[in-house]
Swiss-Prot record:
<dbReference type="GO" id="GO:0046872">
    <property type="term" value="F:metal ion binding"/>
</dbReference>
<feature type="region of interest" description="CR-type-like">
    <location>
        <begin position="113"/>
        <end position="175"/>
    </location>
</feature>
<dbReference type="GO" id="GO:0003756">
    <property type="term" value="F:protein disulfide isomerase activity"/>
</dbReference>
<dbReference type="GO" id="GO:0009507">
    <property type="term" value="C:chloroplast"/>
</dbReference>
<feature type="repeat" description="CXXCXGXG motif">
    <location>
        <begin position="135"/>
        <end position="142"/>
    </location>
</feature>
<comment type="function">
    <text>Protein disulfide-isomerase involved in chloroplast development in cotyledons. Involved in the process of vesicle-derived thylakoid formation, probably at the level of the integration and folding of LHCB proteins at the initial location of integration. Acts only in germinating seeds after dormancy, during the transition from heterotrophic to autotrophic growth.</text>
</comment>
<protein>
    <recommendedName>
        <fullName>Protein disulfide-isomerase SCO2</fullName>
        <ecNumber>5.3.4.1</ecNumber>
    </recommendedName>
</protein>
<keyword id="KW-0934">Plastid</keyword>
<feature type="transit peptide" description="Chloroplast">
    <location>
        <begin position="1"/>
        <end position="30"/>
    </location>
</feature>
<feature type="repeat" description="CXXCXGXG motif">
    <location>
        <begin position="158"/>
        <end position="165"/>
    </location>
</feature>
<keyword id="KW-0677">Repeat</keyword>
<dbReference type="InterPro" id="IPR037477">
    <property type="entry name" value="SCO2"/>
</dbReference>
<feature type="compositionally biased region" description="Basic and acidic residues">
    <location>
        <begin position="42"/>
        <end position="58"/>
    </location>
</feature>
<keyword id="KW-0413">Isomerase</keyword>
<feature type="region of interest" description="Disordered">
    <location>
        <begin position="41"/>
        <end position="67"/>
    </location>
</feature>
<keyword id="KW-0793">Thylakoid</keyword>
<keyword id="KW-0862">Zinc</keyword>
Amino acid sequence: MFRLYPNCSLPSHRPLVFLPRLPSRSLRCRAAADIPLGDGIRLPREADSTSDTARSRDVSVAAGGNGEGAKWRKRRLLWSKSGESYLVDDGDALPLPMTYPDTSPVSPDVIDRRLQCDPVVEDCREVVYEWTGKCRSCQGSGTVSYYKKRGKEVICKCIPCQGIGYVQKITSRTDIEVMEDLDNEPS
């Protein structure tokens, strides 16, 4: 039996204290065994930590194997923080619309008539040029990158071109000889 103050030679009126002999690690684990650390991770209890099967069970729970951790693991797998976009699963590119919704493209003879139109004789509609050019957001690559608050780079699919790299461009300017000149102009 151990007294509370073994070096004291005076008789004590305090009762003797019996302390169980435990390793320091298990004493700390016992004190925090019922407190969850977050996201389904729990420290092993003293009775569980003695056997190897209990240790493997605790590791599987900590990794999200069963119970409360399963929901966390599922959520973690659905949205991984590897820097990939949730649009990365698309196998094929979406079709690129060349006209506005619910309209049909202008035929070449209509464009020729508009070009030959004389504004003195008739009311002429302006010629509208449509072409496909590189996306300005992703520079034709289909992916863009941005940085989060803490400086971590995130790469995802370009939204304006839907990951294709090219977009429909339209203008009513008449001083254009080559449509690609517009792509090379500084903005």
